[in-house]
From Swiss-Prot:
Recorded name of the encoding gene: dapF
Descriptive protein name: Diaminopimelate epimerase
Subunit structure and binding partners: Homodimer.
Residues at which substrate binds: N14, N67, G77, N78, N166, N199, E217, R218, G227, T228
EC annotation from Swiss-Prot or TrEMBL: 5.1.1.7
Keyword Cytoplasm: yes
Protein species of origin: Bacillus velezensis (strain DSM 23117 / BGSC 10A6 / LMG 26770 / FZB42)
Length: 284
């Protein structure tokens, strides 16, 4: 294979290169290598990673995520919205409500479309996993990490750990513009307490229904948005008594806004946009 077709899409600036594996069938042994190449802003297309849209025996499509360092991720909220948009607009499904298979399980997407163009996607992200075993995180397997003190060098932070199919640690800050994202993000991501690494979020509370958010993503670094991270931030806000269940929480990310609702049934609903940037042919 010397080339393949791609579509670049983004959810609030969190951009990926999307490849339709129904048609292209990139070789398994080269996926990590290709993800690194296409993600490069200098020698590739430029993105936070690569997402494959694959056939599934359980749903209309399956999503596989590769970070820009070549590692494979389990879940991506912004990616899910873009996959839902792609699947509907490219006739991989004719339904406006359908499931997407991920490494974390089946996820339901509901789209809002106008003349065949998807304008907004609501994704049922399922129930948050909160125990150390589910994250995973070292320590007592059945314990939760809520408002726990963490010390990184000379910096002390209070963190809440949440998995949305991938691990997150959420730290409240007084001023989001002063969050130590570049200095502590890469340190916390690889903290040995998180054996699979962790996504790092800093959150400033505006009100019970409004949060400012910045993220250092595992395997990708600073990104404009992280859907699962926004979900984790909203869940952490509820767990710490700041927000309430079954209420819309607007999360302001660097790339735009998501609306998160931790419903009474235990599931987290994420609603936001998905955009197509361009499409073309990439030469290996």
């Amino acid at each position: 294979m010397n080339s393949f077709r791609f579509t670049k899409m983004h959810g609030l600036g969190n951009s990926y290169i999307y490849v339709n594996q129904f048609e292209e069938q990139l070789p398994e042994e080269r996926l990590a290598e290709i993800a690194v190449k296409v993600s490069s802003i200098h020698t590739g297309i430029g993105s936070d990673g690569m997402i494959l849209i694959c056939p599934s025996e359980k749903a209309p499509v399956k999503m596989r995520i590769f970070n820009n360092d070549g590692s494979e991720g389990k879940n991506c909220g912004n990616g899910l919205r873009c996959v839902a948009k792609y699947a509907y607009e490219h006739k991989l499904t004719e339904e406006t409500s359908f499931f997407i298979e991920t490494l974390s399980g089946l996820v339901k997407a509901d789209i809002t479309e106008d003349n065949g163009i998807v304008r907004e996607v609501a994704v049922d992200m399922g129930e948050p996993r909160l125990t150390k075993k589910e994250l995973p995180m070292l320590g007592n397997e059945d314990e939760r990490t809520i408002d726990e003190t963490f010390v990184f060098g000379e910096t002390e932070l209070s963190g809440t750990a949440v998995s949305m199919g991938n691990p997150h640690i959420v730290f409240p800050v007084a001023d989001i513009n002063q969050a130590p994202l570049t200095t502590l993000g890469p340190v916390i991501e690889k903290d040995p307490r998180f054996p699979e690494g962790v996504n790092v979020e800093f959150v400033e509370t505006v009100s019970a229904d409004e949060l400012h958010f910045r993220v250092w993503e595992r395997g990708s670094g600073i990104t404009q948005a992280c859907g699962t991270g926004a979900c984790a931030a909203a869940v952490a806000s509820v767990l710490n008594g700041v927000s309430e269940r079954n209420r819309d929480i607007t999360v302001h990310l660097a790339g735009g806004d998501l609306v998160i609702n931790w419903q009474d049934n235990g599931h987290v609903l994420m609603t936001g946009p998905a955009e197509t940037v361009c499409s073309g042919v990439y030469y290996l």
